[in-house]
Swiss-Prot record:
GO terms for biological process: DNA damage response; epigenetic regulation of gene expression; positive regulation of DNA-templated transcription; protein monoubiquitination; protein ubiquitination. Non-catalytic component of the MSL histone acetyltransferase complex, a multiprotein complex that mediates the majority of histone H4 acetylation at 'Lys-16' (H4K16ac), an epigenetic mark that prevents chromatin compaction. The MSL complex is required for chromosome stability and genome integrity by maintaining homeostatic levels of H4K16ac. The MSL complex is also involved in gene dosage by promoting up-regulation of genes expressed by the X chromosome. X up-regulation is required to compensate for autosomal biallelic expression. This is E3 ubiquitin-protein ligase MSL2. Zn(2+) 3 binds at residues 462, 464, 476, 481. CDD domains: MSL2_CXC (cd13122), RING-HC_MSL2 (cd16522). Pathway: Protein modification; protein ubiquitination. InterPro entries: MSL2 (IPR037922), Msl2-CXC (IPR032049), Msl2_Znf-RING (IPR032043), Tesmin/TSO1-like_CXC (IPR033467), Znf_RING (IPR001841), Znf_RING/FYVE/PHD (IPR013083). GO terms for molecular function: histone H2B ubiquitin ligase activity; promoter-enhancer loop anchoring activity; ubiquitin protein ligase activity; zinc ion binding. Gene3D superfamilies: Zinc/RING finger domain, C3HC4 (zinc finger). It is found in: Nucleus; Chromosome. SUPFAM superfamilies: RING/U-box. Zn(2+) 4 binds at residues 462, 483, 490, 493. It comes from the Eukaryota.
Length: 577
């Protein structure tokens, strides 16, 4: 797979670092914003550290990578990515390894420029950015184990294709090649030697043209004799560390030719760069004791200030005659698809457009005078960004914000417990399971927190017996009935022996002793009883039963006078409310 995000972030970060102006606070802010994103794009999804021997899924479009030693372990991503679950599809990605090396070289370059001093002086974001720089530089130190200085150049990962073939004479004496020193002059239309994708011709180069202040020479101690028979038709390898390795020494030129004719051409094309990455077997020829003595005052141009101490370099050459010109270790991929589906871990702020190679390095022209250093008074910095291994970034939140969110969460939970204190246990468990969700990846300080509540399911039936926390069937008695208090009829009442006298139409049932005719009619309509026979008890004969069939209720009630004392015992019905 092609790491589009990491490549685009590397190009943007390199352009900002190389064009950094101490008097421009906006550039400082952009660098502080892009460096954490670049570091996050090269993080292992399992351990969270910088990738070591990175492997990536072959048939996936997600930007998730793991170390070779972390293969098979669980990724720290929530939710998990469905595209890279199968570790059998993971293979070694060489372009990712190159990007990791470029990240280390970029960190080393920053540590030896004025940008590092500005980062240390910035109180708001110094700790996080310094941690990222130390992560890249210390990782490179452990890999290379240099002995001369703490931040040295690591060029062992930068093989350079060469057309010259070394001889097999191991007894060649060390001789400085001062005559073959190449000084590059940059015209007004050329931007640090990279104007277009197709490279530049040799007409733009000059021999022994000084730097903006004075001429700089590089002494190269060679351990072998180089054949120079066909150097008129071929070009020696040129190691431009600013464009390839982004190291701190400005321009290091390893020249093995006695002269260069103006008719030759120096081409830097994307195809040759990609083809150079495929050459695995390269003959390594070491050039030790490379001592750069460059001194200049331009901070963002092709020449940088360096100390006079000697640094150990390991420059490698290959004997592949098919490749000519420069070879960049930072591989430039093909034009990436911008309309791809973005993953959930990427926010809108992370969408960085890929930049062409011609705009990586922008510096002043040769004829321009050295810029006047302006002391910067104000520094604008963003909120410190903490890297998260699941593909996203979260800004660091201060302790006060964390405490406020904790107390807010407790208050919400306490309020929800009070509101559901009189519900059934089943609904109470459902409400406890619904917790407030605070977004972690896109949470910015100052933005209101959104609390998600689940709407409780509406209950069927009346509230009788369900009003308390522990429902009971013996609660609906007389005035304790909530439906009776609200003058409503009970519906699907769970109470045993519900005696609510209100009907569905809002009218109240009448007592039997008030209007007996209407009370019996209401009873028949409410209970659905067909009044065909009523047992009447007589005071004298308790077993006598009068069957009233076919006659209306009024004739039955009118059959006895009001003086009859057995009328109270005749109708065996009670209405207790």
């Amino acid at each position: 797979m092609n790491p589009v995000n990491a490549t685009a972030l590397y190009i943007s970060a390199s352009r900002l670092v190389l064009n950094y102006d101490p008097g421009d606070p906006k550039a400082f802010t952009e660098i502080n914003r892009l460096l954490p994103y670049f570091r996050q794009s090269l993080s292992c999804c399992v351990c969270g550290h910088l990738l070591q021997d990175p492997i990536a899924p072959t048939n996936s479009t997600c930007q998730h990578y793991v170390c070779k030693t972390c293969k098979g372990k669980k990724m720290m991503m929530k939710p998990s990515c469905s595209w890279c679950k199968d570790y059998e599809q993971f293979e070694e990605n060489k372009q990712l390894s190159i990007l990791v090396n470029c990240y280390k070289k970029l960190c080393e370059y920053i540590t030896q420029t004025t940008l590092a001093r500005d980062i240390i002086e910035a109180v708001d974001c110094s700790s996080d950015i310094l941690a990222l720089l130390n992560d890249g530089s210390l990782f490179c130190e452990e890999t290379e184990k240099p002995s001369d200085s703490s931040f040295t150049l690591c060029l062992t990962h930068s093989p350079l294709p060469s057309t010259s073939e070394p001889t097999t004479d191991p007894q060649a004496s060390l001789s400085p090649m001062s005559e073959s020193t190449l000084s590059i002059a940059i015209g007004s239309s050329v931007i640090n030697g990279l104007p277009t994708y197709n490279g530049l011709s040799i007409d733009r180069f000059g021999i022994n043209i000084p730097s903006p202040e004075h001429s700089n020479t590089i002494d190269v101690c060679n351990t072998v004799d180089i054949k120079t028979e066909d150097l008129s038709d071929s070009l020696p390898p040129v190691c431009d560390t600013v464009a390839t390795d982004l190291c701190s020494t400005g321009i290091d030129i390893c020249s093995f030719s006695e002269d260069i004719k103006p008719g030759d051409s120096l081409l830097l094309s994307v195809e040759e760069v990609l083809r150079s990455l495929e050459t695995v077997s390269n003959t390594e020829v070491c050039c030790p004791n490379l001592q750069p003595n460059l001194e200049a005052t331009v901070s963002n141009g092709p020449f940088l200030q360096l100390s006079s101490q000697s640094l150990s370099h390991n420059v490698f050459m290959s004997t592949s005659p098919a490749l000519h010109g420069l070879s960049c270790t930072a591989a430039t991929p093909k034009i990436a698809k911008l309309n791809r589906k973005r993953s959930r871990s990427e926010s809108d702020s992370e969408k960085v457009q890929p930049l062409p190679i011609s705009t990586i390095i922008r510096g002043p022209t040769l004829g321009a005078s050295a810029p006047v250093t302006v002391k910067r008074e104000s520094k604008i910095s963003l909120q410190p960004i903490a890297t998260v291994p699941n593909g996203g970034t979260t800004p660091k939140i201060s302790k006060t914000v964390l405490l406020s969110t904790k107390s807010m969460k407790k208050s919400h939970e306490h309020g929800s417990k009070k509101s559901h204190s009189k519900t059934k246990p089943g609904i109470l468990k459902k409400d406890k399971a619904v917790k407030e969700k605070i977004p972690s990846h896109h949470f910015m300080p100052g933005s209101p927190t959104k609390t998600v509540y689940k709407k409780p399911q509406e209950k069927k039936g009346c509230k009788c017996g369900r009003a308390t926390q522990n429902p009971s069937v013996l609660t609906c008695r007389g005035q304790r009935c909530p439906c009776y208090s609200n003058r409503k009829a009970c519906l699907d009442c769970i109470c045993r022996g519900c005696q609510n006298s209100y009907m569905a139409n809002g009218e109240k049932k009448l007592e039997a002793f008030a209007v007996p005719e209407k009370a019996l009619e209401q009873t028949r309509l409410t209970l659905g009883i067909n009044v065909t026979s009523i047992a009447v008890r007589n005071a004298s004969t308790s077993t006598s039963v009068i069957n009233v069939t076919g006659s209306p209720v009024t004739t039955f009630l009118a059959a006895s006078t009001h003086d009859d004392k057995s009328l109270d015992e005749a109708i065996d019905m009670r209405f207790d409310c």
